[in-house]
């Protein structure tokens, strides 16, 4: 299967002019955000689960 190379600088018609190209900067924002928030949320939920656990 051939996957075409799609450039990230696709011409989008945005209603306002951005000083940078939005699709090319999205991975640099989303990857650290997911990399930091996902472990933090997991640690908080596991901490709350352990705190609410009762020994019967």
From Swiss-Prot:
Task: Please identify the protein, giving its name as recorded.
Answer: Photosystem I reaction center subunit VIII
Biological processes annotated in GO:
photosynthesis
Keyword terms of this UniProt record? Chloroplast, Membrane, Photosynthesis, Photosystem I, Plastid, Thylakoid, Transmembrane, Transmembrane helix
Function summary: May help in the organization of the PsaL subunit.
Q: Which gene encodes it?
A: psaI
Q: How does it sit in the membrane?
A: Single-pass membrane protein
The root-end lineage is: Eukaryota, Viridiplantae, Streptophyta, Embryophyta, Tracheophyta
Q: Name one GO cellular component term.
A: photosystem I
- InterPro entries on file: PSI_PsaI, PSI_PsaI_sf
Q: What is its main location?
A: plastid
Any keyword Plastid?
Answer: yes
Cited Pfam families: PSI_8
The UniProt entry, under SUPFAM superfamilies, shows: Subunit VIII of photosystem I reaction centre, PsaI
Q: What family is this protein classified in?
A: Belongs to the PsaI family.
């Amino acid at each position: 299967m051939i996957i075409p190379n799609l450039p990230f600088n696709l011409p989008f018609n945005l209603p306002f002019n951005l000083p940078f190209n939005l699709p090319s900067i999205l991975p640099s924002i989303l990857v650290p955000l997911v990399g930091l928030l996902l472990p933090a949320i997991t640690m908080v939920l596991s901490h709350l689960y352990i705190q609410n656990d009762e020994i019967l």
